[in-house]
Curated annotation (Swiss-Prot):
InterPro entries, per database record: DHP2, DPH1/DPH2, DPH1/DPH2_1, DPH1/DPH2_3
Family designation: Belongs to the DPH1/DPH2 family. DPH2 subfamily.
Quaternary structure annotation from Swiss-Prot or TrEMBL: Component of the 2-(3-amino-3-carboxypropyl)histidine synthase complex composed of DPH1, DPH2, DPH3 and a NADH-dependent reductase, predominantly CBR1.
Cofactor, free-text remark: Binds 1 [4Fe-4S] cluster per subunit. The cluster facilitates the reduction of the catalytic iron-sulfur cluster in the DPH1 subunit.
Gene name, Swiss-Prot/TrEMBL: DPH2
Gene Ontology biological process terms in this record: protein histidyl modification to diphthamide
Localization (cell): Cytoplasm
An annotated GO cellular component: 2-(3-amino-3-carboxypropyl)histidine synthase complex
Keyword annotations: Cytoplasm, Iron, Iron-sulfur, Metal-binding
Binding, [4Fe-4S] cluster: 104, 125, 353
Name this protein carries in UniProt: 2-(3-amino-3-carboxypropyl)histidine synthase subunit 2
Length: 515
């Protein structure tokens, strides 16, 4: 009955009349990019390479993740892939409306299938993931490579001649990676300047099988390195693409380097390093807000990012050692309304990808910082603000945090600091006493992180270095006491208990006693 009056769920993917329509389908400028105009669907979306990887890996459940702008081409791509892998018993699925963001692999949706292989279409942030094998298919945008070289050389002439910069590092957006060979050949024609290229390395079959490098890390998909024999401070950065999160991340992680961006749409060059100090000033302001916070919320931006799980565990342990209260949240895509529901949280820490890990919007009620900034804030007033070390790489932050933890354990004096001392807040301009939260039902010890007095008898009392009693607070009760509205008036013990009476019965349009 339902088939006669409704369209089947798989109508758009399996209807036989689509064969003739999709047989000669071509990719247009509105689909995968203007560089793919005139190409077939198979060529523009790398169907042959995708099928080859599926067959070599013997994958059976394949997720095809499309951003919103590429959904019109999803049916054509799905049918082209499915017809070539059906004989192996494999099944492909179209994934849309990503849980977190289009730039990251949607691992959560893949786990719902569950999928053992994911094809990611469109723009990508290139943050490594170790949850499942991923194959990236980038957009294809047009680029006049010769014009780009001439414009960038003319704009950065003063930095190369006057400032003593000896090298150039060329970085491009993923939508121009299909022209990588042309970019290398054209940019390397000037032999008087040393040039290195931040090439994109797509995951190989070895990395798809879950293999890691000799250090136990998931290999990076792109690394920005100076030319051989030079330091990074000796180089000028050239970026090919439009302004966005990817460019801003490059700008902040290399704050000491001149950065010039070439916009292919306008064929113009702009110096971005002049605005770097303003961006870093915002991050420094958020850092000082974190110094005054006692309750933190750890936001999981994407569950499939490499090093995200051990980093979350490390951040929770660091906050616990500092007597800070932490909550772990997974809210999908961020917006001010979602985070406003957690009013007791004073500062959020976003564990995210290379492009979505920084939130500078003023619409959020509380500050949102990065894991690197949190580790710096936990050092207290003794921290050293070093913009050249600012990073969104989760693996780097995890390594530094683990090394700092080892030093703290080796130096016993740091674990016996005076946590009840006053500190000055640069944000509010007032003196404050740091809150110390208790964990569990007993007294928390710094030596072995165990709880004492589980049976209700507390034979040991926590004291600070001056041998005075230390006050341990509860995050929930402290926040409730500070609120003006604490709920309806309870009136405990103020009213006599009333006798239970029979209430109304019936429906709203006519109760029993009204008839």
């Amino acid at each position: 009955m339902s088939d006669a009056f409704s369209t089947p769920a798989d109508h758009a993917l399996s209807h036989p009349e689509l064969e003739a329509i999709l047989e000669n389908a071509q990719a247009g400028p509105s689909s995968i990019g203007d560089g793919a105009e005139g190409m077939s669907i198979e060529e523009a979306f790398e169907v042959d390479e995708t099928v080859r990887r599926v067959l070599e890996g013997d994958y059976k459940t394949i997720g095809l993740q499309f951003p919103d702008e590429l959904l019109p081409s999803s049916v054509s791509v799905y049918r082209a892939i499915q017809t070539r892998i059906a004989h192996t018993g494999a099944q492909a699925y179209v994934l849309a409306d990503s849980t977190y963001g289009n730039c990251c692999p949607d691992v959560l949706s893949c786990l719902h299938l569950p999928a053992d292989f994911l094809v990611h279409y469109g723009h990508a942030c290139l943050t490594p993931t170790d949850a499942l094998p991923v194959h990236y298919v980038f957009p294809r945008q047009k680029l006049d490579v010769k014009q780009a070289v001439e414009s960038l050389l003319a704009a950065s002439k003063n930095e190369l001649d006057g400032d003593g910069r000896k090298g150039i590092v060329v970085v491009w957006d993923v939508s121009y990676d299909w022209l990588a060979n042309d970019i290398r050949d054209t940019f390397s024609q000037d032999s008087t300047i040393q040039i290195s290229f931040a090439s994109i390395q797509k995951p190989t079959l070895a990395s798809q099988k879950g293999l890691k490098d000799v250090k136990g890390k998931t290999p990076a998909l792109r690394s920005v390195e100076p030319p051989q024999g030079l330091e990074m401070n000796d180089c000028v950065l050239w970026y090919i693409g439009e302004e966005g999160r990817s460019c801003m991340n490059l700008q902040m992680t290399h704050a000491n380097n001149p950065l010039f961006i070439y916009s292919p749409s306008s064929q113009s060059v702009s110096p971005l390093h002049r605005t770097t100090s303003r961006l870093l000033s915002r991050r420094l302001f958020a850092l000082h807000q974190a110094l005054s916070a006692d309750v933190f919320g750890l936001i999981v931006s994407n569950i499939g990012l490499a090093s995200s799980k051990p980093l979350l565990a490390q951040l929770r342990e660091d906050l616990k050692r500092a007597k800070k209260k932490s909550y772990t949240l997974s809210v999908g895509r961020l917006n001010p309304a979602k985070l406003a529901n957690f009013a007791e949280i004073e500062c959020f820490v976003l564990v995210g990808c290379a492009e979505g890990g920084v939130v500078d919007s003023k619409d959020f009620l509380r500050p949102i910082i990065t894991p690197w900034e949190l580790e710096l804030a936990l050092q207290g007033p003794d921290h050293v603000w070093a913009p050249e070390n600012w990073t969104l790489d989760l693996g780097t932050v995890l390594k530094d945090a683990q090394e700092r933890e080892i030093k703290i354990k080796q130096d016993s004096s740091t674990a016996d600091s005076d946590d009840d001392s006053l500190e000055f807040s640069l944000i509010t301009g007032t003196m404050r006493t740091k809150k110390r939260f208790a964990f569990g039902n007993g007294t928390h010890t710094l030596e072995n992180n165990k709880l004492l007095g589980d049976g209700g008898v507390q034979d040991l009392t926590l004291r600070n270095q001056n041998f005075s009693l230390s006050k341990l607070e509860s995050a929930g009760s402290t926040f409730l006491a500070s609120r003006e509205f604490q709920g309806l008036e309870p009136r405990y013990g103020m009213d006599e208990p009333s006798v239970l009476e029979q209430g109304r019965s019936g429906v709203a349009r006519g109760y029993t006693e009204e008839k």
